[in-house]
Structures are given as structure tokens and as C-alpha cells.
């Protein structure tokens, strides 16, 4: 599971090279400009002037420019992975258990480590450090492999977070609420995707840009992070009340059950709506299938 075929690696490498070339080409005029001036306030002025003179740019380059302009006002809260979707490992887990857990549950290169509860994240481990430890037959707990993360508030601007990640040389930020509890997670990949667009890997579900797909008049596949209000507009039926404490379809499901449901679990939301879990780990809900017994808008 953790190894890709040579063909997939080659295809992904070609995509990455193309992306790097596009970004370098786009940023070369910005780089040349800042060689002449050190004023930070000029950055978005340069971007806006580039947009005005963008006739010779490709569609990808114009999209990146548009994303950069939007980035000026975006905060961590706009893009963070919510607490309910965070996959993490207990500090007391040994290396062998961690290896199996990552294979089965956490298909990512970095995994959060917590002590006691998710409100006490102590850092993260990189999968290459784990493999090195296993290859050299190192025994013991995870403490020696843990790397430090950044603590950030939901209101922090994305550009400020990007600069902080660069200064502190770390790729993960834990978002904390006003009480110091874990509210969400942001990675360097999340920030890059805000600039260049979504970057799919072999673990991403093939949904559309809104993270849901209408299969037919009675079936919708949706990422668990899709907001309930978005689906309500499509379905034509109210799924939650103003006093409910969830915003996503995953949150809706979790209010109906006592724990994260297993893949294949079906839950009746209303007389017309049934939700089936199609992707989940023991710690988080990933994707669901929504069945409409009366069809979209009762059709």
C-alpha cells in the first residue's frame, strides 16, 4: 500500500515538474521586481499588474494569479482540516504498532502524535523516520522520532502562516481554539493547493471540485467535510437546525451515532434520506453515499 508502481511514480514526477516549471515561469517577474525593491507592501501590487498584463499567460498561470490575489484575505479557518477529520496516533504506541496503523489507517507521509487526548498534540512523525528506525531495528517509543509543529490561531492569515512555516522549518500547524484545545490542522500542502489548485495523489477520492458528485437522481457521493448547507440546496430538504453544533455532513452523521461508523454502515437521516459510510478510519469519517428515496427535490 505504501509503495507506488514505477509508472505512477513517473507520471506523478512529470506532473510535479510541469507544476514547478509553471510556478517558476509565473514568479520570475515578481522575483525580478523584488530584486529592485524590498518593500513588502509592493507584493500584491505586482500581482495585480501581472494580472492586467496576463494576455500571454496560460490558463494555469492566470488561475494561479487569481488564487494569489484571493490569498491576501484568507485565514487558516478558511482551509483547515477540522478536528473530526484529524488522524493521529497515541504517544504510547510502539514503532511496530505505529507501522501497522499507518499502513491501515493513515495513508500520509506525516502523522500527528498526541499524549492522552487530541487536545495535547506533542508533534508529528515523518514516515521516512519511522522506516529508518524499523530498518535499523530501533526499539522503544515514538519520542525520539517526533518533530515539532506550529501552534496557530484560526484567524491567522495564510501568508503569515506560510512565512512562519518557512522560518521554523516545519510543515504542520495545529490550530487551537480560545481555550487551547485542538480545533484543526493545516499542512504546507494545504497552503500550496490554495495557490496552484488541488493536487490529487493516489489516496484522494475522485470527486469534483466541490468534493461531491451527483451520480443520478437518487444518489450523491460526498466528502464528509462538505457543508450540510451545500447539500441542502441540492437535495431541497433541511438536514439540520440552527442550534445544531455541526457544519459538515460528517458532523451530521456523527450526531446520530456514538462513534465513527464502520464502512458499509447505513443511517436513516429522514424518511427520504439514507446515508451510507463508504470511506472511514477508526478515528474519522471520510466519504459517504447519500441515497434519496424520493429523488432530488422529490422527483
From Swiss-Prot:
Residues 80-142, 145-202 form the CBS domain. GO terms for cellular component: plasma membrane. Keywords: CBS domain, Repeat. Belongs to the UPF0053 family. Hemolysin C subfamily. PANTHER family: HEMOLYSIN-RELATED, MAGNESIUM AND COBALT EFFLUX PROTEIN CORC. Despite the presence of the tlyC gene, the true SFG rickettsiae are non-hemolytic. This is Hemolysin C homolog. It comes from Rickettsia conorii (strain ATCC VR-613 / Malish 7).
Amino acid at each position: 500500500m505504501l509503495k507506488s508502481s514505477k509508472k505512477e511514480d513517473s507520471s506523478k514526477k512529470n506532473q510535479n515538474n510541469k507544476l514547478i516549471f509553471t510556478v517558476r515561469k509565473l514568479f520570475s517577474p515578481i522575483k525580478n521586481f523584488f530584486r529592485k525593491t524590498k518593500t513588502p507592501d509592493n507584493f500584491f501590487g505586482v500581482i495585480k499588474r501581472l494580472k492586467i498584463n496576463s494576455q500571454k499567460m496560460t490558463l494555469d498561470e492566470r488561475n494561479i494569479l487569481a488564487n494569489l490575489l484571493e490569498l491576501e484575505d484568507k485565514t487558516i479557518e478558511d482551509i483547515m482540516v477540522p478536528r473530526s477529520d484529524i488522524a493521529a496516533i497515541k504517544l504510547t504506541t510502539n514503532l511496530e504498532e505505529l507501522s501497522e496503523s499507518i499502513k491501515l489507517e493513515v495513508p500520509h507521509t506525516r502523522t500527528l502524535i498526541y499524549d492522552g487526548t487530541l487536545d495535547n498534540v506533542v508533534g508529528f512523525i515523518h514516515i521516512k523516520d519511522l522506516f529508518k528506525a524499523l530498518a535499523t531495528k530501533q526499539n522503544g517509543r515514538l519520542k525520539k522520532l517526533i518533530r515539532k509543529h506550529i501552534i496557530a490561531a484560526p484567524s491567522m492569515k495564510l501568508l503569515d502562516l506560510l512565512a512562519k512555516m518557512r522560518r521554523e522549518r516545519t510543515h504542520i500547524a495545529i490550530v487551537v481554539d480560545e481555550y487551547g484545545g485542538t480545533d484543526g490542522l493545516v499542512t504546507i500542502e494545504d497552503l500550496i493547493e490554495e495557490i496552484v489548485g488541488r493536487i490529487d495523489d493516489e489516496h484522494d477520492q475522485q470527486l469534483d471540485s466541490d468534493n461531491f458528485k451527483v451520480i443520478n437522481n437518487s444518489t450523491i457521493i460526498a466528502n464528509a467535510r462538505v457543508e450540510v448547507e451545500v447539500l441542502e440546496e441540492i437535495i431541497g430538504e433541511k438536514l439540520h437546525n440552527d442550534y445544531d453544533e455541526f457544519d459538515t455532513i460528517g458532523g451530521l452523521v456523527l450526531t446520530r451515532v456514538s462513534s465513527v461508523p464502520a464502512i458499509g454502515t447505513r443511517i436513516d437521516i429522514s424518511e427520504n434520506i439514507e446515508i451510507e459510510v463508504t470511506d472511514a478510519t477508526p478515528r474519522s469519517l471520510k466519504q459517504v453515499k447519500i441515497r434519496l428515496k424520493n429523488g432530488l427535490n422529490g422527483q
